Amino acid sequence: MSPVFLIMIPAGYLVGAIPMAYLLSRWRRGIDIRRYGSGNVGASNVIKTAGKKLGLAVFVFDVSKGAIIILLAGWLGLELWQQIVVGLLTIAGHNWPVFLRFNGGRGIATSLGVALVMAPVPALIALSTALTFGFFKKMAPGVFLGVGALPVMSGYFHGFFGVQEHQTVTWGFAGLFLIMIVRRLMAPDSEYSSTVSKAELVFNRMFLDRDIRSRSVWINRNTAAHKEGLGI
């Protein structure tokens, strides 16, 4: 096995584990992003709780770390499957960062960065799908459908979308989709977890990325609890 590949494996994870959402929110707003909004350590929660400018900065950073690490792997001469493994480990690092006791974000922006390098056109279609749903405040289902469509696009329509080495890319996209599902399902239990059946909880987490159907109740729960604890 290539020594470069062996070095890039932990490097990919550690780069992914840099929690920019947490760091910027602490530095510029003095808050622990994990205790506000959805509790997610990612750009979307920063936008809701710390402002659009900070959220955009986090988004750009998270996309960039996914794209740059896989581009670096290619520049160092690694094969495509090795580049993809490094990219997936970067996403895993974002989702389960050692610096935050393995409780990170959802890895969507980092996944976008990786996907854009693997196959730009399908990645942009997935992004467009998520943004379209997001316009109607249905971002989580849009992300699920967009990411889920990636292996379909690269596997069955690779010629139309110009996907090179489509079998390898398809396996990579399948891995990316699996990481997203696992991260959603492994979310810590909330005070609402026991209020729904196991089947509904699995569906809600996998498709809606939350424990309950109500989006407004879910994204405001941490902020309300924090204010109550402060006596506000």
From Swiss-Prot:
Positions of transmembrane segments: 4-24, 54-76, 80-99, 107-127, 143-163, 168-188
Compartments in which it is found: Cell membrane
UniProt EC number: 2.3.1.275
A single GO cellular-component term on record: plasma membrane
Recorded coiled-coil stretches: none
SMART domains: G3P_acyltransf
NCBIfam families given in the database record: PRK14417.1 (NF010993)
Family: Belongs to the PlsY family.
Name assigned to this protein: Glycerol-3-phosphate acyltransferase 4
The species this protein was found in: Dehalococcoides mccartyi (strain CBDB1)
